[in-house]
Amino acid sequence: MTHPFAAWTELDNGTVPIEEGELFYETAGEGPAVVLLHGGMLDQRMWDEQFCWLVGSGHRVIRYDSRGHGLSSTATGDWANHDDLCALLDALEVPSAVLVGLSHGSRVALDTALAHPERVSALALASPGISGRAFTDPFVLGHIKEQVAAIGAPDGLERYVEHFLRMWVDGPHRRPSDVHPGLRERIRASATATAEAHADGVGAGMPLEVGAAGRLSEIRVPTVVFDGDLDSTDISANAHALTLAVPGARRVRVPGAAHMVNLENTALFDHELRAFLSSLAR
């Protein structure tokens, strides 16, 4: 497989078996392991900007498509994302890693830190989801309602994805026209591809989670939390809850960004993530 990063590093990609399926992954570099976990309806490509410099900074970087996303298997029954991640780490012979997640990826990272604490050396949680916490923001709930209404309609996929973009790209404080069109189209393409590829998995099973909301104080690894100042109040509340409950956690408020903080304010996100990783080596 030809890959745009192949020119500067030895890149390995492939699949690893999981229960009732397989995960597609890419890995490159040498050094302490860093795993990148993508947001819901997206895939590992959302980390393109970070993958390159992380490899160059002396890390073994791993990114993968979670079950029901990208090039990984469609869900066929109930599953646990945190167990899938540990199966990937086992296959790649990685005893523990720094987990860097966004949204759904943060949710999986937190569950992994609680269910398998020996596999997690640190957490970088962007626009964090937390298992066991429900959405309450009327902005988010309204768009979820519209997504449900779109299911089965002739133009249902297009409408469903557009409401996804309104929630998780534009955010509650901007119109679509206020957002860089390239970002919207990049996320639209990923979300549409995942929805089309994994349509058969809708309703086939549910992710089994640990209910992290009531257990945040149990986390005992260095943690940094990122949230955009243009994101939903639900995400801001999650970031605040993590900062209060996780011992030593630090919060980075990202200006000029909604949910996709690593893509909307890449310079600040990369600077803070680099500083966090450097602090782990001291």
Predicted segments — roles?
Residues 14, 19-73, 88:
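Conserved HGGG/HGGXW glycine-rich cap/lid loop of the alpha/beta-hydrolase fold
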Residues 80-97:
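Conserved acidic catalytic loop of the alpha/beta-hydrolase fold
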Residues 99-101, 126:
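Short beta-strand immediately N-terminal to the catalytic nucleophile in serine-hydrolase-like folds
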Residues 114-115, 121-153:
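Flexible "cap/lid" loop of the alpha/beta hydrolase fold
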Residues 154-210:
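Conserved alpha/beta-hydrolase catalytic His-Asp/Glu region
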Residues 188-244, 253:
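Conserved serine/cysteine hydrolase catalytic core
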Residues 247-282:
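Catalytic active-site module of serine/aspartate enzymes centered on a nucleophile-bearing elbow/loop
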